Curated annotation (Swiss-Prot):
UniProt xrefs under NCBIfam families: panB, PRK00311.1
InterPro entries (alphabetical): Pantoate_hydroxy_MeTrfase, Pyrv/PenolPyrv_kinase-like_dom, Pyrv_kinase-like_dom_sf
Localization (cell): Cytoplasm
Catalytic activity reported: 3-methyl-2-oxobutanoate + (6R)-5,10-methylene-5,6,7,8-tetrahydrofolate + H2O = 2-dehydropantoate + (6S)-5,6,7,8-tetrahydrofolate
Keyword set includes Metal-binding: yes
Gene Ontology terms for molecular function: 3-methyl-2-oxobutanoate hydroxymethyltransferase activity; magnesium ion binding
Pathway: Cofactor biosynthesis; (R)-pantothenate biosynthesis; (R)-pantoate from 3-methyl-2-oxobutanoate: step 1/2
Residues reported in the UniProt entry to bind Mg(2+): 49, 88, 120
Predominant subcellular localization, coarse grouping: cytoplasm
Protein name: 3-methyl-2-oxobutanoate hydroxymethyltransferase
The keyword Magnesium belongs to this UniProt entry's keyword annotation: yes
């Protein structure tokens, strides 16, 4: 009797090995239902703290809690078989000390079943990245426009548009790579700088509003599907589901009011008497 082989999940070493090779494909995911649809087509899924804005209507990601990330991370892991799953560490869960970061990252790994966590920041959190990786927790880094620091940055501003900013951002990239991160997200960054960083470090770069020369790309799923009312410049909508959802809701409302739904085929009949 043949036994169907289980689908093998993408691993951290496989992501690292894609440096300079076939581009790495990624999207965000926040719950099991949509994760099932996109799982076969991506290399990793990011359960991003952007869920605070996308799913909960928050103005920023700062209000997202560790418990929220764990709940959504677990849902995405349950809904996937193939993609490596990375979960964001939310604001306030890792900055205080490497020890606290490790404690919280352990919770994320244990309670979600994900493979890795993502931390925002460069040189300032390199010590924490090193501390986690030495203790068996894979870390994806995130530099450039870091949404958890928008209060300091003064908003969602593209980074590196002036050459005077390049040295600090390049130092961030080198610091996280040397600390042991297996990949780094480059967000909201001038294209020439993102391309330059990609050539400078030996770990994959994942671009979002960065450069086509990055080793991979990521988008927020809802942006890619056309569900965001004001998508950023770097977003390409591969579908227009927002308009389709509105159209479907309008058609449903009309059918209910006209009493054409539910029709006979949508109702249950009595059992025939014996």
């Amino acid at each position: 009797m043949s036994v169907q082989s289980k689908i093998k999940r993408v691993t951290v070493p496989e992501i690292r090995a894609r440096k300079g090779a076939e581009p790495i494909v990624s999207l965000t995911a926040y719950h099991a239902h949509t994760a099932r649809y996109i799982d076969p087509y991506v290399d990793f899924l990011l359960v991003g703290d952007s869920l605070g804005m996308v799913m909960y209507g928050m103005e920023t990601t700062l209000g997202v809690t560790l418990d929220m990330m764990i709940a959504h991370g677990a849902a995405v892991v349950r809904g996937t078989e193939r993609a490596l799953v990375v979960v964001d560490m939310p604001f306030g869960s890792y900055e205080e000390s490497p020890e606290i970061a490790f404690r919280n990252a352990c919770r994320v790994i244990k309670e979600t079943g994900c493979t890795a966590v993502k931390l925002e920041g460069g040189t300032r959190i390199a010590e924490t990245i090193r501390y986690l990786t030495l203790r068996g927790i894979p870390v994806m880094a995130h530099i450039g426009l870091t949404p958890q620091n928008i209060q300091v940055m003064g908003g969602f501003k593209t980074q590196g548009r002036e050459e005077g900013e390049w040295a600090a951002i390049e130092a961030d990239a080198k610091a996280v790579a040397e600390a042991g991160a297996f990949a780094v997200v480059l967000e909201g960054m001038a294209e020439p700088l993102a391309a330059r960083i990609t050539g400078q470090i030996d770990i994959p770069t994942i671009g979002i509003g960065a450069s086509p020369n990055c080793d991979g790309q990521i988008l927020v799923l809802e942006d890619m599907l056309g569900l965001s009312p004001r998508p950023a410049k770097f977003v390409r909508e591969f579908a227009t589901l927002g308009a389709q959802i509105a159209g479907a809701a309008e058609a449903y409302a009309r059918a209910v009011r006209e009493r054409s739904f539910p029709a006979a085929e949508h109702t249950y009949s009595m059992k025939k008497a014996k």
